Amino acid sequence: MKYDIIGDIHGCLQEFQNLTEKLGYNWSSGLPVHPDQRKLAFVGDITDRGPHSLRMIEIVWELVIHKKVAYYAPGNHCNKLYRFFLGRNVTIAHGLETTVAEYEALPSHKQNMIKEKFITLYEQSPLYHVLDEKRLLVCHAGIRQDYIGRQDKKVQTFVLYGDITGEKHADGSPVRRDWAKEYKGTTWIVYGHTPVKEPRFVNHTVNIDTGAVFGGKLTGLRYPEMEIVSVPSSLPFVPEKFRPIS
């Protein structure tokens, strides 16, 4: 099986359509379909900050849950939206406010439909996907080699948030260790979460979050070809969001 792994979309629907078309997908049915049956895999954070978060939920639900032709690993923004939909007390900030504003503008029956779809998508998706006979792993923020195969709370924190130290940068964002430098495995780990100006290959890991929602690019990785395909963002460039990893 061949896969096209998509970086953090964050509600950037137009960029997602442009990227999938560049990857050879056809949208005539209203969903991206590849003539060679390649499968999409999402590294999470499909919502928040961008303009079309709810449409992204519908598309990913259709592909992953309804048609079962794609893979989705939830990100930290997905986890927070899930908790919001469950009625938990979450702070509506850091991008969640854009998704909530879209949601609250809907009539109640449509709200219920979106909420049910996202809760189902989140609950039926594992923390990470191991594909191609363990040669490929798709997750949101990365994973340590000794965590592969585990699903416990420590692993959940790592795959959602990265290798956080507990310290904060001056702007309040968490300090993260560069786990990829320590990774010695042969399974390719494809992830996102931390915006980088260009896809970052370190050992057998690739960060494909090229900051589409911050005016960078939306990036896909063609696997097993290991080819990078990107499209430019239509949003303004925010340079301070592209922070070097500690």
UniProtKB/Swiss-Prot annotation:
Protein name as catalogued: Bis(5'-nucleosyl)-tetraphosphatase PrpE [asymmetrical]
UniProt-listed InterPro entries: Ap4A_hydrolase, Bis(5'-nucleosyl)-tetraP_PrpE, Calcineurin-like_PHP_ApaH, Metallo-depent_PP-like, MPP_PrpE-like
PANTHER family with a match to the protein in the record: BIS(5'-NUCLEOSYL)-TETRAPHOSPHATASE PRPE [ASYMMETRICAL] (PTHR42850:SF7), METALLOPHOSPHOESTERASE (PTHR42850)
Catalytic reaction(s) noted: P(1),P(4)-bis(5'-guanosyl) tetraphosphate + H2O = GMP + GTP + 2 H(+)
Naturally occurring in which organism (per UniProt): Bacillus cereus (strain AH187)
GO molecular function annotation: bis(5'-nucleosyl)-tetraphosphatase (asymmetrical) activity; nickel cation binding; phosphatase activity
Record-level GO cellular component terms: cytoplasm
Family note: Belongs to the PrpE family.
Sorted UniProt keywords: Hydrolase, Nickel
Keyword Hydrolase: yes
Gene3D superfamilies in alphabetical order: 3.60.21.10
EC category: hydrolase
Record SUPFAM superfamilies: Metallo-dependent phosphatases
Function: Asymmetrically hydrolyzes Ap4p to yield AMP and ATP.
HAMAP family xrefs: PrpE
Enzyme Commission number(s) of this protein: 3.6.1.17
Cofactor(s) needed by this chain: Ni(2+)
Keyword Hydrolase: yes
